[in-house]
């Protein structure tokens, strides 16, 4: 008859106190359940290799020393079985108390106290059980760190997504899919870093806190520096700092880091998110499109093995599966904003008439007719953004460059060289969501001042996402910013698509959450 320690009937509190009593009893016997070190020199793969020529119910003469976390514990008569996990490998440990513990009752006491979640070190002989399972027949087991709390099952985690986000350590211990997702995330960031290093970019770090906010149209987080007695903002983007570096002669720079925006939380938005921004002197937005295509298509091939793959996130709340074919083959599709809106709305927007008051009136009227909700203040920027979201973004399933942004939507972008009222800016969308924002950088100081004044007008109208005026940055431009292209890529959403995540919180180790209800 076997006894399993996998599922405890007692309450979590009772289990916790029982485990503490067990550990205190072991410690009273002189057993250190939190040793400083355990020496081991083998891996689970060493065991699998050693057992290749071993038959069922046979032992080799190969000794191993290993460590791992117990994920299942079973007692059958006088033999204890432990399934131990390390990294992505699992291995069975067999401990025969008749053979190993006759002259060492403390050893039996130790192994009988081992439960799921405990971290153990063990020494033994490689072999196979009667059923042919590869095992280590242990003659010594040591508790290296006990798990005092009841160890949840993978089933419990899947049915309770809040537990995943609030207790990521537990999720990673029992949910292999989650572990793999974050391993893939690391590979994605590593590939991006290697790509830019390879083409001659310098990785830099810029401030997270600053007494000004800029670089993107977004609502910032505010904090206070007690010693300096000043308010500081968490950065919404590192753009203005990175362009200062280009002015200073660092002609190819990039930064991978956190940005913060005090805005909504949903399936694809988290207030704290990871992005890469890169700036390249003597390049324009056409060059940036080529870089984005090469970077992302290569990344997709690395992770998925092909430019084409199926994005199929599983929504835990509904268990509904969505299958979205995505194709990152180059060149990416392109859509011009005004051309597409004119076709969809049956109107005639141009770069010349887009800034006229009657154009804003027309767009407000169209939105009312089509029941498109736009929050006040209904600025031209907000109206255009709403129509882009309604008519253009849903067309962008495969990677698509959206181009032709009017000046009012792009205060830091340079005027288009041949289209009045338009900037040399693009956003790249995939699966209807923005992944990339880039443009030929505006490097004319007086024109940049004028753009900031336009943003001031929106701010005075009540737009709390308008970009604030930054005279210091304009003075930086007066030292000479060479023709430059700048680009930002959201890493979290990219990871979502490459790991079949339905929620951005699934690809952020510690996402922003509401306070837990006590």
Swiss-Prot record:
Keyword Iron: no
One Gene Ontology cellular component annotation held by this UniProt entry: cytosol
Protein name listed in UniProt: Probable lysine--tRNA ligase, cytoplasmic
One MF term in the entry's GO annotations: tRNA binding
InterPro entries referenced in this protein's UniProt entry, alphabetically: Aa-tRNA-synt_II (IPR004364), aa-tRNA-synth_II (IPR006195), aa-tRNA-synth_II/BPL/LPL (IPR045864), Lys-tRNA-ligase_II (IPR002313), Lys-tRNA-ligase_II_bac/euk (IPR034762), Lys-tRNA-ligase_II_N (IPR044136), Lys-tRNA-synth_II_C (IPR018149), NA-bd_OB-fold (IPR012340)
EC number(s) recorded for this UniProt protein: 6.1.1.6
Organism of derivation: Enterocytozoon bieneusi (strain H348)
PANTHER family, per the entry: LYSINE--TRNA LIGASE, LYSYL-TRNA SYNTHETASE
Family affiliation: Belongs to the class-II aminoacyl-tRNA synthetase family.
